[in-house]
């Protein structure tokens, strides 16, 4: 009986060529050797550690390192029937090793020479990110002939953070990034890179980018050009000394997974960066196949790309190889990438953590001795020693580089993995060995105490004591807001209000809720928290007063990841101040401490207000008619709307929140923008109770165009004519128009433009209304009239702001 046709079986005796001589290559050889499909691994040139592995692994002493020399290694690979090439370092990838092997039909786990420019040119990679809307630091690139232009750019104060980072665009052995503290240091850094050529040709182009702050993570991800699969995020330690002090190195240790890389953070890294990167490279015509190693800064606004690398990281790889479980075949994963079928592969990881600690030569990262003999005693179970700068000499392993070894361990907890790695180091010695004793200190410093008697709410990140401290801190200011009908103490299960004591005969309750929007981002970035509480109250109570309602009481909602009592007290003190201005009682609220829901020191606010109005005084009245007069009450500034656009304009103007405001030399940008929303209650209530007003509009997001028509019913044909020449546009709005190139039409449908409240009155009551407002501390003016035409008609729009 003839055999049924079947697909050929995958090759089960693979020969793999590993290019490189470091700890990364030793770790890759270690994991590849576990594959049942791999028969032989040749490491070229390898090191003392790969020389001692035996079994499937051997070294090859064949020179390569520049395109002409690829010929000899390619010819050798052809003769030896190599099935897969895995370059370790970035230089051969940028130099075109993938293309050299591709010509003879040998697949390479690594990007094409063009795709490798993601690492080979920082200027190119930044332009790529900008083109594909991938979040990264603001930047500008310069050629080496534009030194004076680069200096002038820094002098122009282009970044909100006030600091810059100088990067040599080309490959500089991991040393081409300079982080000056001051402008003077930045100028010196530019000179060293662009004029003095400290990094040689790597400095032919320079990137000047904004300094970002926050924790860093490294995400290594496999890609086949379509699918991208990240490994757990790692954190490395670049500085030579404990506490991240001293000179920068290639890396003194790493650990994974990094606790800071929460599920939410990783999802954003994938959705906002990794997937758009792979899609963008494919769209640009350079599909990325290989290892995409992305450095992220976790900022208050989310993950931002620091840099791309196009190969396995060192020393992250050493730790990550220990995390891969026994069922994960690394050779199969690499082949799936080059064969464009990564979506068919599943990577598995051990439960727990892995750590790598680098042992370096004395003097590293400067000059250091070589050829020193080493003592390598047996290490505890669970410890792996990956060689980097070593070689075999007369059957003795000696030092042969700056970073000599990476001692690695995995364990169920990070603390156990760290302790196990350091116990392994105790079995190793060579003259002048240098290593950091604080690897993973960032994560360990936030660990709960060892062997707790039992889990507590505080151990989960919620401090009941902090909540109690906050209640005690705010009790005096809350008590000051009491009014007839509201006498309960804060800290209970809610608030009660006795409506009978408020003195109303035929009351209608009116409620409103609101937040502060992205004005909160300004408060957080500026570090000023005592005014946004006023905004929170104002936004809700001003919505009550336009219905004729007097605010009775207010409740707030304050949410954060970790309660900072002084900050929360500032916010709630502001809320109490807003309540005092509105004449309402702060009778309760909720402070929600929710670890993992918010990032860092971020918090969010919401408010809820309840007011009352006599049935006969509900606004708007049904008798609004054409010819009625519109009165305008000034705003105190942007109030709490339009801040997404305002922040964008400020950013594009290269202003920081601490800079002097261009529209007011007596204050800073941040202080000016945080001027609290005006509370209109007390000036308006007397006129409401006297029956002077027919309707009102609180000018919030949507400006005049969207808010004023809300006074009229949908069945009405009424609208308004607004005379913009009746007042002078305040300086802040003129600056925003000019700096953002915002058209007048956009201004009046986005911002309040200096008018926070519009009142409709009968023409014969206009003078009485103006007098009532003035007597109660509010200057107003006639800004227009009601007409038989829907919408808002503007007079003077063409000259608005000039």
Curated annotation (Swiss-Prot):
GO terms for cellular component: cytosol
Subunit structure, as described in the record: Homodimer.
Designated name of the protein: Bifunctional purine biosynthetic protein ADE5,7
Localization per record: Cytoplasm, Cytosol
GO MF term list: ATP binding; metal ion binding; phosphoribosylamine-glycine ligase activity; phosphoribosylformylglycinamidine cyclo-ligase activity
This protein's UniProt keywords: ATP-binding, Cytoplasm, Ligase, Magnesium, Manganese, Metal-binding, Multifunctional enzyme, Nucleotide-binding, Purine biosynthesis
EC number in record: 6.3.4.13, 6.3.3.1
Knocked-out gene: effects: Growth auxotrophic for adenine. Avirulent in a mouse inhalation infection model. Does not appear to affect production of the virulence factors melanin, protease, urease, or phospholipase B, or on capsule formation.
Region GARS: start-end pairs: 1-444
Protein origin, superkingdom: Eukaryota
ATP-grasp domain boundaries: 126-339
Family (UniProt): In the N-terminal section; belongs to the GARS family. In the C-terminal section; belongs to the AIR synthase family.
Gene Ontology biological process terms from the UniProt entry: 'de novo' IMP biosynthetic process; adenine biosynthetic process
């Amino acid at each position: 009986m003839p055999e049924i046709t079947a697909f050929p079986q995958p090759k089960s005796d693979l020969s793999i060529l590993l290019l490189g001589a470091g700890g990364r290559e030793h770790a890759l050889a270690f994991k590849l050797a576990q594959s049942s499909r791999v028969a032989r691994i040749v490491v070229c040139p390898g090191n003392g550690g790969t020389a001692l592995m035996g079994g499937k692994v051997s070294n090859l002493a064949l020179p390569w390192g520049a395109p002409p020399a690829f010929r000899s290694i390619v010819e050798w690979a052809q003769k030896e029937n190599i099935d897969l090439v895995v370059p370790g370092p970035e230089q051969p990838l940028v130099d075109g090793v993938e293309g050299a092997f591709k010509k003879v039909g040998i697949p390479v786990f690594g990007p094409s020479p063009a795709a490798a420019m993601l690492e080979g040119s920082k200027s190119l990679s930044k332009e790529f990110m900008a083109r594909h809307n991938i979040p990264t630091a603001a930047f500008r690139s310069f050629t080496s002939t534009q030194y004076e232009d680069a200096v002038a750019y820094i002098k122009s104060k282009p970044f909100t953070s006030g600091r810059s980072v100088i990067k040599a665009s080309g490959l500089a052995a991991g040393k081409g990034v300079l982080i000056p503290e001051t402008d003077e240091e930045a100028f010196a850094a530019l000179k060293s890179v662009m004029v003095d050529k400290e990094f040689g040709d790597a400095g032919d182009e320079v990137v000047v980018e904004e300094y970002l702050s926050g924790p860093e993570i490294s995400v290594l991800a496999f890609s086949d050009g379509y699918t991208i699969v990240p490994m757990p995020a790692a954190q490395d330690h670049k500085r030579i000394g404990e506490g991240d002090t001293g000179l920068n190195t290639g890396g003194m240790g790493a650990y994974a997974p990094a606790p800071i890389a929460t599920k939410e953070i990783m999802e954003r890294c994938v959705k906002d960066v990794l997937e758009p990167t792979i899609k963008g490279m494919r769209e640009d015509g350079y599909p990325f196949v290989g290892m995409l190693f992305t450095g992220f800064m976790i900022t208050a606004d989310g993950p931002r790309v620091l840099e791309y690398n196009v190969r396995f990281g060192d020393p992250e790889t050493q730790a990550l190889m220990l995390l891969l479980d026994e069922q994960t075949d690394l050779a199969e994963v690499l082949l799936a990438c080059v064969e464009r079928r990564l979506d068919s592969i599943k990577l598995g990881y051990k439960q727990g953590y892995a750590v790598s600690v680098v042992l370096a030569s004395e003097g590293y990262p400067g000059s250091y001795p070589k050829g020193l003999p080493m003592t390598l005693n047996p290490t505890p179970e669970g410890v792996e020693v990956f060689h980097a700068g070593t070689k075999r000499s007369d059957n003795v392993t000696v030092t042969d580089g700056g970073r000599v070894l990476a001692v690695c361990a995995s364990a169920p907890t990070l603390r156990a993995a760290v302790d196990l790695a350091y116990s392994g180091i105790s079995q190793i010695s060579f003259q002048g060995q240098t290593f950091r004793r604080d690897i993973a200190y960032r994560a360990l410093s936030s660990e709960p105490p060892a062997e707790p008697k039992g889990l507590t709410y505080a151990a989960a990140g919620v401090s009941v004591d902090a909540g109690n401290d906050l209640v005690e801190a705010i009790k005096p200011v809350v008590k000051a807001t009491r009014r007839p009908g509201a006498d309960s103490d804060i800290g209970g299960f809610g608030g009660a209000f006795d409506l009978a004591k408020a003195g109303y005969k035929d009351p209608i309750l009116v409620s409103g809720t609101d937040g502060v929007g992205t004005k909160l981002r300004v408060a957080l970035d500026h570090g000023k928290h005592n005014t946004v509480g006023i905004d929170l109250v104002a936004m809700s109570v001003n919505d009550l007063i336009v219905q004729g309602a007097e605010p009775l009481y207010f409740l707030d909602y304050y949410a954060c990841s970790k309660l900072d009592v002084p900050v929360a007290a500032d916010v709630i003190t502001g809320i109490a101040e807003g309540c005092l201005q509105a004449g309402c009682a702060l009778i309760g609220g909720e402070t929600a401490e929710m670890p993992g829901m918010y990032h860092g020191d971020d918090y969010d606010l919401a408010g809820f207000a309840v007011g009352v109005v006599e049935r006969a005084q509900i606004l708007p009245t049904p008798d609004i008619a054409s010819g009625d007069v519109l009165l305008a009450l000034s705003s105190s500034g942007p109030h709490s709307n339009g801040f997404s656009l305002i922040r964008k304009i400020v950013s594009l103007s290269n202003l920081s929140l601490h800079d002097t405001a261009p529209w007011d030399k007596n204050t800073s940008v941040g202080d000016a923008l945080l001027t609290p929303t005006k509370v209109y209650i007390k000036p308006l209530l007397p006129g409401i109770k006297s029956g002077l007003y027919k309707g009102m509009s609180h000018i919030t997001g949507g400006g005049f165009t969207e808010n004023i028509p809300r006074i009229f019913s949908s069945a009405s044909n009424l609208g308004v004519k607004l005379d913009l020449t009746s007042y002078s546009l305040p300086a802040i709005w003129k600056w925003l128009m000019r700096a953002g190139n915002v058209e007048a039409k956009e201004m009046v449908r986005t911002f309040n433009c200096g008018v926070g409240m519009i009142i409709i009155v009968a023409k014969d009551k206009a003078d009485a209304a103006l007098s009532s407002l003035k007597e109660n501390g509010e200057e107003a003016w006639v800004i227009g009239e009601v007409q038989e035409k829907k919408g808002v008609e503007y007079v003077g729009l063409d000259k608005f702001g000039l």
